[in-house]
Amino acid sequence: NFPSGGQKTMSDENSGNAIDPNTMSIIVTKGSLDWAYPPFILGTTAAAMGLEVTMFFTFYGLPLLLKKMDLKVTPLGNAAMKMPMMGGHMVMPNIVAAIPGVDAMASKMMKNLIKKNGVASIEELRELAVEADVRMIGCQMTMDLFDYQKDQMIDGIEVGGAATYIEVATKSHINLFI
């Protein structure tokens, strides 16, 4: 039985596929500045707490493994986006995203806010993940689809497909889709 009361259906304890309570897997599907933080914060925190962490980067999350990143944020589709300004919070309506240069401005504001508040950059968090032995897998299909080469990626990543992730996920206690 799982702690939630569910039943194991894939295997039993003796088959070698038992769920390890000290494991976490994360599917990383988004690569914008704001969406890059949750998987790296959760992954590095879990690793620091002694969990074995695997991150599977696919589709728009795959560029987070590139040696050179140029992360941006946009108000488009970010209805909850409010930037601290002049003692309050400035709402960034979706329509504003249609104005040329707004994404660049929003990205610069967000990067300044991150730096001002002493929050680690994505590059720093990614390096922490490497140092903490977080297993990072780039999706082979996505690499092929978007014409990425492994030499464009940071050192130490693996390349694998959905089956590689599923093998990890079926043994992980915590599975996140971000």
Task: Give residue ranges: language-model regions.
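Short, glycine-rich nucleotide/cofactor-binding loops
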Residues: 26-36, 65-66, 113-114
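Histidine-anchored nucleotide/phosphate-binding helix
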Residues: 37-49, 55
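Short internal beta-strands
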Residues: 53-59, 137-140
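Short, Lys/Arg-enriched N-terminal segments with co-localized hydrophobic residues
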Residues: 1-9
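A glycine-rich helix N-cap at a beta->alpha junction
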Residues: 73-110, 114, 118
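A charged, amphipathic interaction segment
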Residues: 103-160, 164
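N-terminal beta-loop-helix "entrance" segment that forms/cooperates
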Residues: 62-75
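Short hydrophobic/aromatic patches at helix-to-coil boundaries
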Residues: 175-178
